[in-house]
């Protein structure tokens, strides 16, 4: 049955009494004020209640805190392990080696925490042999390397409030979010003289957490030439070296070019299927030392999508006067490489405890935030510094893992062994 307009209106709810617009404005302002006060006390008393998307973006934090909380601060090279061998004979259960005292050197647990470190590639370095052809020398180097790997594992187990194991990008990110304040601990060897001429040994190192291998240290080996001796042995990478690079690609181990000759570096860029790293090197253009990377090789690194992790070693930082090397000089190297090939390819590789002293302002591991603040003050963006302080090297590690997965059907490199029966 149809209804007239009057009938339709009778079904509508009564119209409310008019509210003066000034009263409505006061009411709205009062409500907003109460809401803001409630939010302030909620977030002040319970910071975890802050909206997750703002926490992820770090919009409520200073630029320095945004950098340090978006990614684990990751150092590509630290010699704490060999320092512990040299000065404590690898004894970490004695009263003079604790997690609450300052240890001799540039690294200890209180200073690591103050420096806000989130992940570390601990070098399990063993020096080159003075007489490499003497019987038993290669065995001793491999044994000593296993002792250094074991040392880091024992440190992780004995100091769990500070260290946590990691062997992948996923581990590092998981630890960063679920074990805050603990340092994800990965390993790196510093020269293929440490593998005793055996791909099998290199694979065992990988099983124990070694995620990068420098092709050389300060000596040539059967795989590659170092930058240190004047006379090259192979003219770069040997045939065996090409095979070992392919094996590292297959197993998911980063190829590290620090300490290698320029010819070795160029050869590696031509054969590797994965991004590479310089774990602790700087810009040759600013300090023309053979340990640093020239511009043309930085361009090759960009094409490879790899990373150079800027060293703090004074002799590689300020070639005019190493004793005058400073935090500002290190920042210059970071900016130079970032401006030349992009900050995507820059990281931090301190070499703490591998040098007699650090640059002024970067004397020990507690000083990382000062370097980050200097770069912020110079106008480097938060996003770029998130990459420099950890995002870039973790991206490289992730890419290396991806290449390894793509090579899963490739057979491992086998050692040639002597016939058992002759």
UniProtKB/Swiss-Prot annotation:
The keyword Cell wall biogenesis/degradation does not apply. InterPro entries: Metal_Hydrolase, Pept_M19. CDD domains: rDP_like. Disulfide bonds join 128-219, 287-319. GO terms for molecular function: metal ion binding; metallodipeptidase activity. It is an enzyme of class 3 (hydrolase). Pathway: Mycotoxin biosynthesis. It is found in: Membrane. Signal peptide: none annotated. It is a single-pass membrane protein. One of its GO terms (cellular component) is membrane. Substrate binds at residues 217, 291, 351. It catalyses: an L-aminoacyl-L-amino acid + H2O = 2 an L-alpha-amino acid. Keywords: Dipeptidase, Disulfide bond, Glycoprotein, Hydrolase, Membrane, Metal-binding, Metalloprotease, Protease, Transmembrane, Transmembrane helix, Zinc. Zn(2+) binds at residues 77, 79, 190. This is Dipeptidase aclJ. It comes from Aspergillus oryzae (strain ATCC 42149 / RIB 40).
